[in-house]
Amino acid sequence: MLLPHKALVQIEVSRYSFVKRRPNGSVDFVSPFPSLFSYGSVHGVMADDGDPQDALVVGCAPRRGEAVEYPVWGQVFFVDAGVADHKWIVGPRQPSEVQWAMVEGFFRLYAWAKRWMSLWRGLSGETACKGVERKPSVAG
């Protein structure tokens, strides 16, 4: 999918929260470690898994319930129980090298936790972080 220039994101998980929520506000699961990023759903965009497109916010920390609009800088290629579940990376400014590394490291650890949850829920299929793609910069 071609990434858009900007995305309007409804925040469902505040940065440092342990609770992963569904778009309707119900609890999906409690993580063994906190989210390093605010996380939510993109308004008006459906993902391949049938849910609203996921997005994480890098560079600031909007709280659960807020709606924020930021440029899209890239995406995390993620597979959850055999289904593509990519996450757009948004924020007020282009992520630094350290932030890019944090995003990839976090989602590799997150994949490990999700694999265990999938096993517990009786789901099969691969769960993995397949890497991070940076949106090409536009020379101005």
Regions found by a protein language model. Name each.
Residues 1-140:
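Hydrophobic N-terminal alpha-helices or hydrophobic patches in metabolic proteins across all domains
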